[in-house]
């Protein structure tokens, strides 16, 4: 008989059992195994500028020296903001490619001459553009591959059996985790579990990660935030106080009203920007989490939720990136379903309350609890099991 109980499992479920599975831990893994990928993400992603993430510009350069093995015994520079913010919301910040910084670096490496000049070489021209592609690929395909390898190293901490939860083993499970601890630790049948973003047993590099930002909407928001900055004004002052037409690539690419009137200085810079913009757009498209197609591919699961009477959310942050899945669940279930949602911090309580308002869940149909409470219930129901 099909169970009327659905569990929705998030990363907090594995964290509760002692698995070091936060994205901050993934950062530590990259530092040990793929520092170039780490350096790329630290330097070029997130709303903070490259300089503000480090104590000095020399530290920025040392990131790449160390990651490429060019530094003898150097220690990776401490990036407080990256460690405390960027990686805690890793998937969200995949949408925060710092276009400005990438174009600044491109401008440095571009040949300082025109295509018809004697000193021009196409290999120099494509060196910068290929560098952009390498950087973006390291945060796309290489990042996915390394994430999968890291997932396969995860384990629950010693003594986790004392913390096992009282879970209905006949229920249905929708998990956002890639780990298989529901099967290997709790003995849940694989046929009862839907791994919505993939499982560690899938082909390497196939796990689904990505941001939820709308490409067009995110771009417009970025332009609006930056359009009044001094560096994006049509005219700038040089060190002697003389005005000159803004020639920064980010300004020419995104804020110049008439491209034909820009201070491009050479056709090389103009052509390079057009190619770079195309590569940026490809990156955003590849790294946007395809929730609509994922939901469509799992429609059999969602259509089967009509009989659900109780939903238990264990360790899920109820983040915006996953709301489309909850929208589809809400469409499939009845209006009298009882919810129980775990919380860990005061911020979680606020998220749960906002979640209930969004879906019209009254307070008498939503029980908030800590995962430790389920562990206590397990001790009461089956004291010999641990």
Segments from the language model and where they lie:
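An N-terminal structural lobe/cap that precedes and organizes the functional/catalytic core
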Residues: 1-40
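Short, conserved aromatic-histidine micro-motifs
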Residues: 31-46, 339-347
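Extended, H/D-rich, highly charged conserved domains that either
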Residues: 40-277
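Conserved beta-strand -> loop -> alpha-helix junction used to position metal-binding or nucleic-acid-contacting
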Residues: 9, 27-30, 194-199, 369-370
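SIR2/sirtuin-family catalytic core signature
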Residues: 1-17, 169, 281, 285-288, ...
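Short secondary-structure boundary/capping segments
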Residues: 20-30, 188-192, 328-329, 356-357
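Phosphate/oxyanion-binding active-site loops and adjacent basic polyanion-contact surfaces
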Residues: 19-26, 37, 143, 147, ...
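Hydrophobic, Leu/Ile/Phe/Ala-enriched alpha-helical segments that form helix-helix packing faces
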Residues: 30, 164, 182-186, 333, ...
